[in-house]
């Protein structure tokens, strides 16, 4: 198939805004496309060479190399290319114009007889696709020269219009505005017999997120082949998405009165695929992130008790010394391509699993949630770092609200509420009311540090095993002359701080809660209120576990600090000099801000 057919379609699509007209153009294009190359045509329409999840290299061509390639292909100087690019503001248009000038010179015989005049051939879609693939896959020593030679050769054979779109494709600026939905509309019409085939095409794409692959099956094997599509280990499934509500009563009505309510962790959503010892991990956006999480790969090999499986969960950063969850931002350290072994130590992670999509040849996406969850529990050997997401089953709005506040207290973003009825299937690639996320519509950002009193201590884990690993902290309520718990802090301590804790706390350890202490959370060791520490956190939040300002803002809950961190000891302050509960209440109200949707 000549590449000019594709370039002509690109040009027509650029000047229209109607999706219906776009569909008509794609229908005409697909009718001309040989079935064996439909996948390549679809990828080029999407502005890519292959799906992101394959983890294959991108083109890796910068602007300077493109300018060199255009100069070589058009017998121009690089400064001429740069000058035209500057005036037009579009490198593709610059290539088109220079190519037209060059071809006009050739026609008029104005070129020197000694000049190199390449033999021009008509480009095909396959040639363009294969050449660009070779450009992308060229790596290592000498790869820049290889890329330049391939691009210059491709542009030499291209017409002016073809050159424009080749350059734009390589730049990642095709700007056609064609969505996957429009491509699926056209595929259904051409190969499926009409719009009635559209849901079948979409479901197949949702189960195997590779539209070129789906198009080729449809074009070469027919609609019945798509009807039989199941999940395939190694090809990501497009994730199911949730609607949003902030009222527990309304939420339970929406899902049928009873639901699973599970923590919505502040981490990276991950789809984990297992085939024997081979593991793939895909992000919410279906990018291959396996290399970022070699520790999760190890967990999946060990603890998924099935030969083939596709499970979903959340990868969450945590502090191994305290067990506390850490903010999503800390996972950014895992993005590095080098020294990942260092990042593993700096940012340890846990996996909280919440769904099963496929296991040992059986598609679970059409099964209701209780059945999927039961099978998930069956095939997972739960450990501290690889476990099922914390959840409850409830039909009670008050119980839902309490669990929501507990989730916030434990470092989660909120909760997910999931329908349990027989139609509660896994709707791949779809946002709907089978899942509802309940997140706070407010937050109280913590700008200032506070001074809190130690009222208890917790034994450490991991490196802190055999030592104290965290402290229970309180504010002072002068009206009642009591100390009210605010947070459990285990972060921010240096090793020497941890080493000194036994000696510091020893004079104040008591066998029971001090009579001036009001606390719901029970530490391993109670401490007489005496030591004061400066604490900072991400934000002030409401908690059913702490007693600072209990019942003042909302029945049954107090004020707490999310992601608290130790700054330093305040030996200059006595316990009654600590931040008061009233001060925390004022901070909470003053800093309250609406969260954007």
Swiss-Prot record:
GO terms for molecular function: ATP binding; DNA binding; DNA ligase (ATP) activity; metal ion binding. Optimum pH is 6.5. Belongs to the ATP-dependent DNA ligase family. Its EC number is 6.5.1.7. Keywords: ATP-binding, Cell cycle, Cell division, DNA damage, DNA recombination, DNA repair, DNA replication, Ligase, Magnesium, Manganese, Metal-binding, Nucleotide-binding. It comes from the Archaea. The active site is at 264 (n6-amp-lysine intermediate). Pfam families: DNA_ligase_A_C, DNA_ligase_A_M, DNA_ligase_A_N. PROSITE patterns: DNA_LIGASE_A1, DNA_LIGASE_A2, DNA_LIGASE_A3. Optimum temperature is 75 degrees Celsius. Activity declines at temperatures from 75 to 80 degrees Celsius. The keyword Nucleotide-binding applies. Its cofactor is Mg(2+); Mn(2+). Inhibited by Ca(2+) and Zn(2+). NCBIfam families: dnl1. InterPro entries: ATP-dep_DNA_ligase, DNA_ligae_ATP-dep_bac/arc, DNA_ligase_ATP-dep, DNA_ligase_ATP-dep_C, DNA_ligase_ATP-dep_cent, DNA_ligase_ATP-dep_CS, DNA_ligase_ATP-dep_N, DNA_ligase_N_sf. DNA ligase that seals nicks in double-stranded DNA during DNA replication, DNA recombination and DNA repair. Can use both ATP and ADP. It catalyses: ATP + (deoxyribonucleotide)n-3'-hydroxyl + 5'-phospho-(deoxyribonucleotide)m = (deoxyribonucleotide)n+m + AMP + diphosphate; ADP + (deoxyribonucleotide)n-3'-hydroxyl + 5'-phospho-(deoxyribonucleotide)m = (deoxyribonucleotide)n+m + AMP + phosphate; GTP + (deoxyribonucleotide)n-3'-hydroxyl + 5'-phospho-(deoxyribonucleotide)m = (deoxyribonucleotide)n+m + GMP + diphosphate. One of its GO terms (biological process) is cell division. This is DNA ligase. ATP binds at residues 262, 269, 284, 314, 354, 431, 437.
């Amino acid at each position: 198939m000549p590449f000019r057919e594709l370039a002509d379609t690109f040009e027509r699509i650029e000047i229209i805004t109607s999706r219906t007209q776009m569909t008509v153009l794609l229908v005409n294009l697909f009718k001309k496309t040989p079935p064996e190359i439909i996948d390549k045509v679809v990828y080029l329409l999407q502005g890519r060479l292959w799906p992101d999840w394959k983890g294959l290299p991108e083109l890796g061509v910068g602007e300077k190399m493109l300018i060199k390639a255009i100069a070589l292909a058009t017998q121009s100087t690089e400064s001429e290319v740069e000058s035209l690019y500057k005036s037009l503001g579009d490198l593709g248009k610059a290539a088109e114009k220079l190519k037209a000038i060059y071809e006009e010179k050739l026609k008029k015989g104005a070129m020197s007889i000694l000049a190199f005049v390449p033999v021009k051939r008509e480009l095909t879609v396959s040639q363009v696709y294969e050449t660009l693939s070779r450009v992308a896959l060229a790596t290592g020593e000498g790869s820049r020269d290889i890329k330049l030679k391939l691009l210059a050769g491709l542009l030499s054979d291209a017409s002016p219009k073809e050159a424009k779109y080749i350059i734009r494709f390589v730049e990642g600026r095709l700007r056609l505005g064609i969505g996957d939905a429009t491509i699926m509309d056209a595929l259904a019409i051409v190969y499926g017999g009409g719009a009635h085939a559209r849901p079948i095409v979409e479901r197949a794409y949702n189960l195997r997120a590779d539209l070129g692959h789906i198009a080729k099956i449809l074009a070469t094997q027919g609609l019945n082949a798509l009807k039989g599509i199941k999940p395939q280990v190694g090809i990501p499934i497009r994730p199911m998405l949730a609607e949003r509500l902030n009222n527990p009563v309304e939420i339970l009505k929406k899902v049928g009165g009873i639901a699973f309510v599970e923590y919505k962790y502040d981490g990276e959503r991950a789809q984990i695929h297992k085939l024997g010892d081979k593991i793939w991990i895909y992000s919410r956006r279906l990018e291959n992130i396996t290399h970022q999480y070699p520790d999760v790969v190890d967990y999946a090999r060990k603890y998924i008790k099935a030969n083939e499986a596709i499970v979903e969960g959340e990868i969450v950063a945590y502090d191994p010394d305290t067990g506390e969850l850490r903010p999503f931002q800390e996972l950014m350290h895992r993005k590095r391509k080098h020294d990942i072994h260092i990042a593993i130590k700096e940012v340890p992670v846990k996996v909280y699993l919440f769904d099963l999509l496929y296991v040992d040849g059986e598609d679970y996406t059409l099964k209701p949630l209780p059945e999927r969850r039961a099978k998930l529990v069956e095939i997972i050997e739960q450990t501290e770092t690889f476990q099922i997401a914390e959840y409850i089953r409830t039909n009670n709005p008050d119980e839902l609200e309490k669990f929501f506040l507990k989730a916030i207290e434990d470092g989660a973003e909120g909760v997910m509420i999931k329908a349990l009825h027989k139609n509660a299937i896994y709707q791949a690639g779809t946002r709907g009311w089978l899942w509802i996320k309940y997140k706070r519509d407010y937050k109280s950002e913590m700008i200032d540090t506070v001074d809190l009193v130690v009222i208890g201590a917790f034994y450490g884990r991991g490196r802190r095993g055999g030592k104290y690993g965290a402290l229970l902290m309180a504010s002072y309520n002068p009206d009642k002359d009591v100390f009210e718990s605010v947070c459990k802090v285990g972060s921010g301590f240096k090793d020497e701080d941890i080493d000194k804790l036994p000696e510091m706390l020893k004079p104040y350890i008591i066998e029971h809660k001090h009579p001036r202490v009001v606390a719901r959370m029970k530490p391993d060791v109670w401490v007489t209120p005496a030591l004061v520490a400066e604490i900072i956190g991400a934000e002030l939040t409401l908690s059913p576990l702490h007693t600072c300002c209990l019942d003042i803002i909302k029945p049954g809950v107090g004020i707490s600090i999310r992601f608290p961190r130790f700054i330093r000891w305040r030996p200059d302050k006595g316990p009654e000099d600590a931040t008061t509960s009233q001060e925390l209440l004022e901070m909470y109200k003053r800093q309250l801000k609406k969260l954007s949707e």
